[in-house]
């Protein structure tokens, strides 16, 4: 199992037992507004997401982790292959109680290190809605550069990326 510890957090693959805690964080109204909408119940959606993440770990050797603080699931972060772009993204989402504490930067930095140093990926991108300035600030803090606007799952997004040569950890 691919477990990563940061200075303050534990990142580990999500398990079936995490599905209710995952649904509670992921479909919190302040989190859901930034992510793609879901047209089914939160528990079913969290079960499908955990199954997809587990498949990513099995087939690619990476997928988003659950982010744990003092044993509590507070979010997700990690690498995600996006077939529509044939590229790997770094993503994060945290429960609002944990915003503004530097956790997004801390976990995304760990995910980028895993992608470049462990998996030897050549390029990692991130995308978010144009009005999500907090996530864009995290991206820039980590060295990602704006490249283009894209449409993903019907939503407008900005695309920033970083390549292994520019990654400084």
Residue ranges and their predicted role:
Residues 1-34, 51, 64-169:
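Acyl-donor (CoA/ACP) binding surface of acyl/acetyltransferases
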Residues 38-40:
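Short glycine-enriched, charge-decorated loop/helix-capping segments at active-site entrances
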Residues 42-60:
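Active-site rim helix/loop that mediates acceptor-substrate recognition in acyltransferases
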């Amino acid at each position: 199992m691919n477990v990563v510890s940061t200075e303050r957090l534990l990142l580990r693959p999500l398990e079936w037992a995490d599905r209710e805690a995952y649904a509670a964080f992921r479909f919190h109204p302040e989190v859901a507004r930034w992510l793609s909408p879901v047209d089914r119940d939160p528990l079913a959606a969290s079960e499908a997401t955990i199954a997809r993440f587990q498949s990513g770990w099995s087939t690619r050797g990476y997928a988003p982790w659950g982010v744990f603080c003092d044993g509590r699931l507070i979010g997700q972060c990690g690498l995600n292959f996006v077939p529509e772009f044939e590229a790997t993204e770094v993503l994060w989402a945290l429960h609002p109680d944990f915003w503004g504490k530097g956790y997004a930067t801390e976990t995304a930095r760990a995910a980028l290190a895993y992608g470049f140093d462990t998996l030897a990926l050549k390029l990692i991108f991130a995308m978010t809605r144009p009005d999500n300035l907090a996530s864009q600030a995290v991206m820039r803090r980590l060295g990602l550069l704006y490249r283009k606007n894209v449409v993903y799952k019907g939503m407008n997004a900005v695309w920033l990326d970083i390549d292994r040569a520019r990654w400084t950890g």
